[in-house]
UniProtKB/Swiss-Prot annotation:
It catalyses: heme b + (2E,6E)-farnesyl diphosphate + H2O = Fe(II)-heme o + diphosphate. Belongs to the UbiA prenyltransferase family. Protoheme IX farnesyltransferase subfamily. InterPro entries: Protohaem_IX_farnesylTrfase, UbiA_prenyltransferase, UbiA_prenylTrfase_CS, UbiA_sf. The gene is ctaB. Its EC number is 2.5.1.141. This is Protoheme IX farnesyltransferase. It is found in: Cell membrane. Coiled coil: none annotated. It is a multi-pass membrane protein. Gene3D superfamilies: UbiA prenyltransferase. Converts heme B (protoheme IX) to heme O by substitution of the vinyl group on carbon 2 of heme B porphyrin ring with a hydroxyethyl farnesyl side group. Keywords: Cell membrane, Heme biosynthesis, Membrane, Transferase, Transmembrane, Transmembrane helix.
């Protein structure tokens, strides 16, 4: 093979690899990881033991495609503000690694594929819930709430709670009080998880007129709201104990993890009211660790003999 041909092949290979990486980035894989953390444990709880491993794998694949579709639509819709905000400068529609058309077609393809896949691999209730999650995230949160109200993440966060319902429905074919409580745990957890991040990137959101709570209210007000939602999350997590018959492992995780999460929110608020330097990302990272610990306990508890 001559040098010119080899060079062209190398460029094409690099181009394909970079394009593939851009498509993956469009789905926001780090967000998807957190969503999947809640899915598999709920399936174990719904089964009261290990479900069929192929069902778990199939639902996780479907959930990945579904969340990826919603995130890709979000990137397409928000491409105008992503070009202005510093923290989104490396997204593929900003860098030009993907065209607008490529992103939109990709979002549609994996979205439709996720619905069909979940319907075939599990049941059509799970598929319908997945469709509802995509539609809610795209139309209610991204197109309606995000740029209009500081409560955007409160109500828009409902889309991120859907994986627990999807996981439960995939196993049982219905919805009961236990998954509703799990839904509410994630719903109440979302604001104190996301608001600290918006405090760090307050200037970014202000530059594009997105009315995040950190933009329209002071640090102390945001800190107080974070405390209230963290306490509500802890209280809601304890409701699962009598409703789903959770055992010692879950109870300890809910109390210890929830207590730590609440402590970090109080610490953030105390620094804010004293006008001292704050570290909102401590709460952000603590919230991720807390939710992961809690749902790990959700999955472990049904497998134990006590």
């Amino acid at each position: 093979m001559n040098v010119a041909v080899q060079s062209r092949v190398d460029r094409e290979t690099i181009g394909v690899a970079r394009k593939t990486k851009a498509y993956v980035a469009l789905t926001k894989p780090r967000v998807i990881e957190l969503l999947l953390v809640t899915t598999a444990p709920v399936m174990i709880l719904a089964q009261g033991g290990w479900p069929n491993p192929w069902l778990i794998l199939g639902v996780l694949v479907g959930g990945t495609l579904s969340a990826g579709s919603a995130n890709a639509f979000n990137c397409y819709i928000d491409r105008d503000i992503d070009r202005v905000m510093k923290r989104t400068q490396r997204r593929p529609l900003v860098t030009g690694e993907l065209t607008d058309r490529e992103a939109l077609v990709f979002a549609w393809i994996i979205g439709v594929a996720s619905i069909v896949w979940l319907g075939v691999i599990s049941n059509w209730l799970a598929a319908a819930l997945s469709l509802a999650a995509i539609l809610f995230y795209v139309f209610v949160y991204t197109l309606w709430l995000k740029r209009r109200t500081p409560q955007n993440i409160v109500w828009g966060g409902a889309a991120g709670c859907m994986p627990v319902l999807i996981g439960w429905a995939a196993v049982t074919g219905d919805i009961s009080w236990a998954p509703v409580i799990l839904f509410m745990i994630v719903f109440l957890w979302t604001p104190p998880h996301y608001w600290p991040l918006s405090m760090k990137y307050r200037d970014d959101y202000a530059s594009v007129n997105v009315p995040m709570l950190a933009v329209v209210r002071g640090r102390a007000a945001v800190g107080l709201q974070t405390i209230l939602y963290a306490w509500a999350t802890l209280a809601c997590s304890l409701l699962l104990i009598p409703v789903a018959g959770m055992g010692l492992v879950y109870t300890l995780a809910a109390l210890a993890g929830g207590g730590w999460f609440v402590y970090e929110t109080h610490r953030l608020y105390d620094l804010a009211v004293r006008h001292e330097p704050i570290k909102p990302m401590r709460v952000f990272h603590a919230s991720i660790s807390y939710l992961s610990l809690l749902f790990l306990a959700v999955g472990i508890d049904p497998l134990l003999p006590f």
